[in-house]
């Protein structure tokens, strides 16, 4: 994904109100309950969609937007798997749609735990493979979806992997293939919460593609339908939440 493509995503997001509204629901979920005047790191900030929303909704937060690609709208260019911050710097680490692009996602989780203050949280929204979403991601999405990935190194290309190659199966592999002892050793208080959520509104919005099948006036009812419909078979996204213990044992 080049800087030009990030600019294109910014343009579409600014012009496509229904898409920004859908993302706004996810952004608000990640912001909910963050401590007043907290210091927050956004990892994988990419086209810089989250930070303007966060700074408008929660102006009390000290926000740092980080991405691998240097861009004027983000604060720092660095690899989320090797974070350039001291231990216990942030009250929260958040992000949307970036974990499934990482060549060594468990390295990121370790780094996130390291830079979190005691009691801090990692929160993210990522693609999720379910019986409903698998064929959509596998056959209709440019990134695809692979079952049975190695959660430590989901991309076999290793160092030859392009920075923004992705696979929707990564998050499911992490949720099902990483034992609790690994999370404890990484610095969290146990296995993260992986809460599947529907994303019919996003699906009907057609994402960053041209047009939308979801009129904006139907967005509210569709989001409520998303929240009320059973998710076990239909979820397309997952909300991840991991907490660092209040103190080391």
Predicted regions and their residues:
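Class I SAM-dependent methyltransferase Rossmann-like catalytic core
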Residues: 1-24
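Class I SAM-dependent methyltransferase SAM/SAH-binding core
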Residues: 41-82
């Amino acid at each position: 994904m080049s800087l030009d493509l990030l600019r294109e995503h910014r343009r579409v997001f600014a012009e496509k109100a229904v898409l920004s509204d859908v993302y706004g629901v996810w952004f608000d979920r990640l912001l909910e309950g963050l401590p007043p005047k907290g210091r927050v790191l956004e990892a994988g900030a990419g086209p810089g969609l989250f930070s303007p929303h966060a700074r408008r909704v929660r102006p009390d937060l000290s926000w740092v937007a980080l991405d691998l690609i240097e861009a004027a709208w983000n604060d720092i260019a660095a690899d989320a798997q090797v974070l350039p911050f001291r231990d216990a710097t942030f009250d929260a680490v958040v992000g949307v749609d970036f974990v499934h692009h990482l060549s060594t996602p468990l390295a990121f989780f370790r780094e996130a735990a390291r830079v979190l203050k005691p009691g801090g949280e990692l929160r993210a929204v990522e693609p999720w493979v379910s019986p409903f979403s698998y064929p959509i991601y596998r056959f209709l999405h440019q990134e695809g979806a692979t079952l049975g990935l190695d959660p430590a190194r989901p991309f076999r290309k290793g160092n030859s992997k392009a920075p923004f190659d992705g696979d929707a199966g990564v998050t499911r592999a992490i949720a099902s293939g990483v034992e609790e002892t690994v999370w404890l050793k990484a610095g969290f208080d146990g296995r993260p919460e992986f809460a599947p959520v529907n994303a019919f509104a996003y699906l009907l919005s057609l994402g960053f593609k041209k047009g939308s099948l979801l009129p904006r006036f139907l967005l509210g009812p569709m989001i409520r339908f998303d929240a009320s419909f059973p998710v076990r078979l239909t979820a397309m996204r997952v909300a991840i939440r991991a907490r660092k213990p209040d103190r080391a044992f």
